[in-house]
Swiss-Prot record:
Protein name: Chorismate synthase
List of residues binding FMN: R129, S130, S131, N241, A242, G285, K300, P301, T302, S303, S304, R326
InterPro entries: Chorismate_synth, Chorismate_synth_AroC_sf, Chorismate_synthase_CS
One Gene Ontology term, aspect cellular component: cytosol
Required cofactor(s): FMNH2
Cofactor note text: Reduced FMN (FMNH(2)).
Source organism per UniProt: Parvibaculum lavamentivorans (strain DS-1 / DSM 13023 / NCIMB 13966)
Summary of the function given for this chain in its UniProt record: This reaction introduces a second double bond into the aromatic ring system.
Length: 365
């Protein structure tokens, strides 16, 4: 199996490479008669596309999406038909010549070596299939998933850049769109601008932590043991390029709490059961509680840097390498909409599976 597909009932297959003619995805399992046109998908792709500030790669890709199948116009409204939805995004600004020096060399920190060891062949141009360019297709698929989740709000924010964290007391969702970092803390965003400018000018890179919050998630999504909502969400986020860690709710921070501190106490309220806190991140026993579902993931520093690094050639000889081309000094910035998309896809899949198993018999129905 090549493992280019994820999901169970809402299934997403992505295809394409960084420097190929195009990339895209096939989404299978979306219900019929969902209003969906290219503009609905484009608005989310525009949030991820490169070249929007000096802090992201200057590769100029419009990321214009084309719907090739799976929709039909009826009564003047373009809607899904219930058949596979094929989406394509053309690559228009490849510069493969930038990678001529690494034809025989493996870039440290990249998937060059492991792809070669596994397949015996690799696309060295921008990393081929392992490039973060592949995530454009995930964002497109996430737009389809969002169309299935009108009662949910899925938002992401950058909460740490390099060693610099936000002050959670300053969290303001309205600030997220007011800076190039998707940062909810205006003071931190101003500090990050100075920090990342210094990183960028030095030809280096830094990592980041992204937080994704889904509101309006009904109780009951997910299944015990092997179909846990948090397990599948962790898997989906971990599959994003450069991600090295995932946590749900307080995550690793829960290890420092006492049982009294960590347990989210409950009480009856005017609208049902209410929680005093959300250390669990909206998931207990693998099943959603009805609270916000909260996840964070850590992105490593971009491996493409200007400093010479030691490596080996395909023939096994020691050498040095300097990575050329256009790269993100902090790939975590553009990972925010990607994380949102993966959250949306997992929730859409879990919603379909919940309905298939429970019908209208669940307590939450």
């Amino acid at each position: 199996m090549s493992h280019n597909t994820f999901g169970h009932l809402f299934r997403v297959t992505t295809w394409g490479e960084s420097h190929g003619p195009a990339l895209g995805c096939v989404v299978d399992g979306a219900p019929p008669r969902l209003p969906l046109k290219a503009e609905d998908i484009q608005q989310w792709l525009d949030r991820r596309k490169p070249g929007q500030s000096r802090f992201t790669t200057q590769r100029r890709e419009p990321d214009a999406v084309k719907i090739l199948s799976g929709t039909f116009v009826e009564d003047g409204i373009e809607m899904t038909t219930g058949t596979p939805i094929s989406l394509m995004i053309e690559n228009v600004d490849q510069r493969s010549k930038d990678y001529g020096d690494i034809v025989e060399k493996f870039r440290p920190g990249h998937a060059d070596l492991t792809y070669f060891l596994k397949y015996g062949i690799r696309d060295y141009r921008g990393g081929g299939r392992s490039s973060a360019r592949e995530t454009a297709a995930r964002v497109a698929a996430g737009a389809v998933a969002r169309a299935m989740l009108p009662e949910m709000m899925i938002r992401g924010a950058l909460v740490q850049m390099g060693p610099h964290k936000i002050d959670r007391a300053n969290w303001d969702w309205n600030e997220v769109g007011n800076n190039p970092f998707w940062c909810p803390d205006a003071k931190a965003a101003a500090e990050w601008e100075i920090y990342l400018d210094s990183v960028r000018k030095a030809g280096s890179s830094c990592g980041a932590v992204i937080e994704i919050v889904a509101s309006g998630v009904p109780a009951g999504l997910g299944s015990p043991i092997y179909g846990k909502l948090d397990a599948e969400l962790a898997s989906a986020l971990m599959s994003i390029n450069a991600v090295k860690g995932v946590e749900i709710g307080d995550g690793f921070g829960a290890a420092a709490l006492s049982g009294e501190e960590n347990a989210d106490e409950m009480q009856s309220g005017p609208h049902g059961i209410e929680f005093s806190s959300n250390h669990a991140g909206g998931v207990l026993g693998g099943i959603s509680t009805g609270q916000d579902v909260v996840a964070r993931f850590a992105v490593k520093p971009t491996s493409s840097i200007l400093s010479p690094r030691k490596t080996v050639t395909k023939g096994g000889d020691d050498t040095e390498i300097v990575t050329k081309g256009r790269h993100d000094p902090c790939v975590g910035i553009r990972a925010v909409p990607v994380g949102e998309a993966m959250m949306a896809c997992v929730l859409a899949d879990q919603l379909l599976r919940h309905r298939a198993q429970m019908g209208g018999s669940g307590r939450n129905e």
